[in-house]
Design a protein with these regions (language model features):
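Short secondary-structure boundary/capping segments
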Residues: 34-35, 60, 80, 143-145
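A short beta-turn/loop motif at secondary-structure boundaries
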Residues: 51-53, 96-98, 143-147
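Short, surface-exposed beta-strand-loop junctions and turns on beta-sheet-rich folds
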Residues: 76-78, 97, 169-170
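Short beta-strand segments
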Residues: 40-74, 80-82, 88-93, 101-105
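Short, basic/aromatic recognition patches
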Residues: 16-44
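Structural motif corresponding to alpha-helix initiation and N-cap regions
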Residues: 30, 75-76
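Charged, gly/pro-rich active-site loop segments
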Residues: 1-27, 101-175
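Alpha-helix boundary recognition
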Residues: 37-38, 83-84, 126
Length: 175
């Protein structure tokens, strides 16, 4: 977010960290990083428990309107953690040493309760996974199995780190 105007920045400042990049490597473009976020089917989320211990788990997320969006059950550990600390990291990539790209997205998770936004997100989830994640908007999130509300969150990036492999490069996109 641009602190002077209070608006969200959608085109980041991009820098290459030469210390952790191969000689002659170039920065990963924001377009390449964003395309990878859009295509990713699985992410890992890191949150912080109230006692300061980290918590990490896999989940699905969608990139829409310049942000990542994810959901969780009200009683799941990540939801409990987000009640007291909105700082979050979402990561995606591959476990290969010499190919692909890993992305780390840092920011603050914000609850989504706006019906129009929930409708757009439910549609995005349905289309991304061929109906495997079929949500219906409810008053406070998505309607889950039974009576439990599925909480929906938006993560607008503060920073996105792109770790390209083959050749190696370490790029920082700052918003």
């Amino acid at each position: 977010m641009d602190s002077a105007s209070g608006t969200f920045v959608t085109e980041p400042t991009t820098t290459l960290n030469a210390l952790f990049s191969a000689p002659g490597a170039t920065a990963t473009s924001w377009d390449d990083a964003r395309n990878t976020l859009e295509a990713a089917e699985l992410f890992w989320i890191a949150t912080v428990r109230s006692d300061g211990r980290p918590h990490m788990t896999p989940l699905v997320a969608v990139w829409l309107d310049d942000a990542l969006h994810f959901c969780t059950g009200e009683s799941e550990q990540k939801a409990v953690n987000l009640r007291h600390n909105h700082s979050v990291i979402l990561m995606t990539g591959c476990n290969q040493w010499d190919g692909g790209m890993d992305l780390v997205v840092e920011g603050q998770a914000v609850r989504v309760t706006d019906q129009h936004t929930l409708e757009k997100l439910a549609e995005a989830w349905t289309h991304k996974w061929d109906g495997s994640w079929d949500f219906e908007p409810g008053p406070d999130g998505f309607k889950g199995n039974g009576n439990e509300t599925v909480l929906v969150f938006t993560l607008r990036p503060d920073k996105v780190f792109a770790f390209a492999k083959g050749p190696f490069s370490h790029t920082r996109h700052s918003f």
